[in-house]
Amino acid sequence: SNLSEESDMSKKIIFITGVTSGVGRETARRFIKEGWKVIGTGRRQSRLDELAAELGGDFLPLCFDVAKRDVVVEMFANLPEGFKDIDVLLNNAGSSIGQNPAQSGNMDDWDEMIATNINGLLYCTRCVLPGMIERGTGHIVNIGSVAGNRAFKCGNVYGATKLS
């Protein structure tokens, strides 16, 4: 009915990266419970499918890697009607691979960690900001880690990405 469509259009929208586990998953559950629409991203389609079955029609699962700039730009450009006007961006996706001593660490792992933890956050933020500025409203929340402030063994690169 027309009334439910209007009601549906008035729901606030949160975009959560890294929604398939931990903080991202629990945040999605909470926002759905509070009556929001949730766009959730992850790299594992099977986990997104499980979450979609649980959360229902107000959850839009998107399977992609936030570290891939062209893919991020394309995904944001092609959001379906009813999910375009994002009220909150939760940059939650993160990688912690490659936690080795600096002298013997795998530089490919470090590149992947930097691409996800820093570049992915920047790509998503850049895609969301124009709409928020145009509407004069919006919030961006970046999930950090105590690892950005406290050193831990073999956490050199991870700590740097979480402090950025």
Task: List the model feature ranges, each with a label.
Residues T20-S21:
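Conserved glycine-rich cofactor-binding loop
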Residues N100-A102, N106-I114:
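Substrate-binding pocket helix/loop in short-chain dehydrogenase/reductase
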Residues S145:
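Residue(s) in the substrate-gating loop at a strand-loop-helix junction
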Residues T125, T161:
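Active-site helix of classical SDR
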Residues G105, A151-G159:
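Active-site loop-to-helix junction immediately N-terminal to the catalytic Tyr of the SDR YXXXK motif
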Residues W36-E50:
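Conserved glycine-rich Rossmann-like NAD(P)H-binding loop of the short-chain dehydrogenase/reductase
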